[in-house]
Amino acid sequence: MIDRREILDAAAQTSLTPHVVEKDYVLGWMLAGISRHAELADNWIFKGGTCLKKCFFETYRFSEDLDFTLRDAGQIDETFLKRVFAEIGERIRDETGIEIPAQLQEFEILQNPRGKTMCQGKVSYKGPVSSSHGLPRIKLDLTADERIVLPPVRVQIFHPYSDAPEEGIEVLAYDYVEAFAEKFRALAERTRPRDLYDVVNLYRNVEARPEPGPFAEVLRAKCEFKGMGLPCLTDLEPHRADLEAGWVHMLDHQLPALLPVASFWDELPEIFAWLAGGRSPVLTAMPIGSENVVIRDRIVPLPTGARGQAFIDLIRFAATNHLLVEIDYVDKQGVRSTREIEAYSLRRSKAGDVLLMAVRAADGQARSYLLEKIFGVRPTQKSFRPRYPIELTPSGLQSIPRRSSASFRLGA
C-alpha cells in the first residue's frame, strides 16, 4: 500500500480531500481485482462516470462508484458476489495492503422498473488514510438489463500512484461513444447534476466528439431499449429547479472548483442542435505560438525539482472545464503578480522551454507564459467561452479518443 503522505500530497495538488483521493486509489485496485478474476474479466463491462474518469479523461470529475453491465445475468446473485469479492479482497490485500473485509460487504438484489434483476452493492475498505471506525465504502451498481450497442474495448485505466503495476491495469469497458450516449440518455431519464456535468464536459472535448449522425444512431438504440424517444431540450426543462438545487451538494466534493450550474445549462441548446445534425462552431487557431510544438505528454519532462507537473494538472482541469485559472507569475522584468487567464495549450519552444499559451482575461490578449516562472496556480469559479481550440488533453496512458469515427457498426 502506498504511504499516507502520497495521498495527502495528491490531495493538496488537486485541491480535493484526502478521502476522495484515497477512494480513487482504492477504485483503481478494485478494478484490477475485477479485471483479473477469471469469472468476471470477460463478463463485466465497465461504464458510467468512474469509467469516463479512469479510462478516458483524467481531468474528469472524481467519481465514487463502479457501474457495470453484466453479460451473464446469473452472476447477479448474492452468494456468488460475496464469494468473488472475498477472493478479490484477499488478492488486493496481499498485493497492496488495502483491507477489504469480507464480512462488511453488502449486496442487495433488487428489481428495476422493468422487472429485471439488478444489484446495489457496498464494499468497505481501509486504505492509507482511513480510520478503523466507520470504514468508507465503494458503491457497486450491477445490471444485465442493457443493450450493448458497440463492441466493448480493452482500456488501460489511469492510476497515477507509485504502486501501479508495471503492466498497468486493463479493464473491459464501454466504447467511448456508447459511454457518452448512455450518459446522454441518463440526462433525459433522471436530469441529475452529475448527468448534466458529464454530458456538457464530454461535448466540450472537441477532439473526441463523435459525428452527430452516427452518435444519434447509438443514442437512439440505447433509448429505444428503455422505451424512450430521442431526447430533446424540452424534456429537461421541468427538472431544472431540482437540478439547480442539488448542483453544489452532488458535485462540489468531486472537483477542485465548480462552475455555476447556469454555465452548463446554457450550453444545452448548442448540444441539442449538434445532436440534430447542426454544425458546431469551428474555432480558429491561436494567433501566437504556431511555430512551437504542442505538448501532449501526460507527464511533461521537466527539470529535477520543478513544481510544474502539479500546476499542469490543475491547468488542464481548468481548461477542460472552461474555468479561468489564476497564476502567480514572474514576468521578464522580474515583477511577480497574479493574473487570471484562459488556458489553451502547452508548447515547447525551439529553445526547449515549456510555454503555457493563454489569453489574459483582463484584456483578451493572447500571451505565452514560461512554465518555470509560474509559482502558483488556482482554478477559479469563473467560466469562459473558448476563443481558440483547447489543446490540453494529454495522450499516452489512457485511450483518449481522437475525433471518433464517422460510422459505427451497431451490435445486436
Predicted feature descriptions by range:
Residues 46-50:
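Glycine-rich beta-strand-to-loop/alpha-helix junction loops that act as flexible
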Residues 1-44, 54-66, 70-304, 309, ...:
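Structured mid-to-C-terminal alpha-helical surface segments
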